[in-house]
Swiss-Prot record:
GO molecular function list: 4 iron, 4 sulfur cluster binding; 4-hydroxy-3-methylbut-2-en-1-yl diphosphate synthase activity (ferredoxin); 4-hydroxy-3-methylbut-2-enyl-diphosphate synthase activity (flavodoxin); iron ion binding
Enzyme Commission number(s): 1.17.7.3
Name this protein carries in UniProt: 4-hydroxy-3-methylbut-2-en-1-yl diphosphate synthase (flavodoxin)
Catalytic activity: (2E)-4-hydroxy-3-methylbut-2-enyl diphosphate + oxidized [flavodoxin] + H2O + 2 H(+) = 2-C-methyl-D-erythritol 2,4-cyclic diphosphate + reduced [flavodoxin]
Record's keyword terms, sorted: 4Fe-4S, Iron, Iron-sulfur, Isoprene biosynthesis, Metal-binding, Oxidoreductase
Native species: Ruthia magnifica subsp. Calyptogena magnifica
Amino acid sequence: MKPVYIIQRRKSKQVFVGDVAIGGDAPISVQSMTNTETTDVKATVAQIQAIQNAGADLVRVSVPTIDAAEAFKIIKKQVNIPLISDIHFDYKIALKVAEYGADCLRINPGNIGREDRIREVVAAAIDHNIPIRIGVNAGSLEKDLQKKYTEPTPEAMVESAFRQIDILDKLNFDNFKISLKASEIFMTVFAYQQLASQIDNPLHLGITEAGSLRFGTIKSSIGLGLLLSEGIGDTIRISLASDPVDEVRVGFDILKSLNLRSKGVNLIACPSCSRQKFDVIKIVNELESRLEGITAPIDVAVIGCVVNGPGEAKAVSVGLIGGEPNLLYLDGKTHSKITNENLVNELEAQVRNRLKSP
């Protein structure tokens, strides 16, 4: 089925985090962040690998101390995905991790300090040919901006970003991306809209401290959905109080829903009602669990009755319609009858077979 609407993305410059392009005509990348103690090398490496296996393009690692920087050096050698170092307060840590192989340096304008410190961070980024992310957060704005605006506002966040941009411009450094994050949806959206109209550097999107898996997913989907639908955004991170792997899955689901990036199974399912001829909810949950590891794009429909079933099944690669009997559709055409006892096994087999077909 052809999309009704194709989002026209904002034109932006391109930077590279490791071998991952961000901005320009590159796909919108999905990233997450470790929540282990960085000094626990084994646990951090394991979590990075889990995030990577979930499909993430990039991983951010907090580096709060020199000891964590030393651990980062070891971690970097044990993984094969670009790592972004998250730096707050101590600019000297940024200098260390740049030397140790960081693929990008995230600095917070609210706490990184004076211009001379930023100059040193930029010099390190130039020496090692890595980008910087200017990561503005509503909760940690510069003290004078807090006093000027009395509370976080989109305008305060944009002003914070431009202070850093002006410094980087003076240094002829253009290898950077920017984020403007708040936990309030419209503050975040308005800040990004203002900034996006004034610069062409790539933008990292996120609703910070969005909350639990359920509510954080809802907030992030609304906030990022508004921006992405306007073509704003080049890389995303879904901030959830949950397993980082969940962040990756939600991120790709948002992009998939907007037809911005296809990855994994797009599972279409009815909410079920008394007309259903099999337990739709049970079948969908089990099928989704079994197909979770698939990264190749494929559309699958599970519809419990014949009201909308035929129309949905004709538009996907694998479709199931509840009836007497149930019908299996492949590539929009009726393929076979299928009993309730074997629904999940048959659907899983057909999905995997379709992905193997040339």
